[in-house]
Amino acid sequence: MRVNVLGNGDWADLFKRGTEGKLLVCNMPPMQLTKEEVYASCMVDFKMMAALTEGSVNLGMYDWVLGNRPRRWMESHPAFYLKYSQNIKGFWTHVPPYAQLPGHAKSQAATNYSCGHMAVDYACRKMRATEVHLY
């Protein structure tokens, strides 16, 4: 199965709507996409959780795959969890060894692990993608 990972970087324009495969987006997609087009929005940081909580960002139209820090956010903000629980496709809390940089505290590994890295890891390990395209 092919999985496309769409980030917000300079090369996101290379992604064409209707491209074969399932689509994972990093946080907020760089273009308007429907729920039907997006398999899930992947989020890993407190910054996105805070933006969703305050209402400055709306991703309620998508399913979510959330990392370690969003999971911790939900544990400390139960009202937020209840409000958005229907959006949560799942939590992906695996942090690979390469995210643990030499000389950094072990707790820093999840911080070093970006949304794009998590989306690719999720595509390969959970979705069992045989082909992953990054945009």
Regions from the PLM with identified roles:
Residues 10, 17-131:
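Acidic/Gly/His-enriched mid-domain segments of enzyme catalytic cores or analogous surface patches
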Residues 1-3:
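Extreme N-terminal starter segment of soluble prokaryotic enzymes
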Residues 135:
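Histidine/lysine/aspartate-rich catalytic loop segments that bind and position anionic ligands
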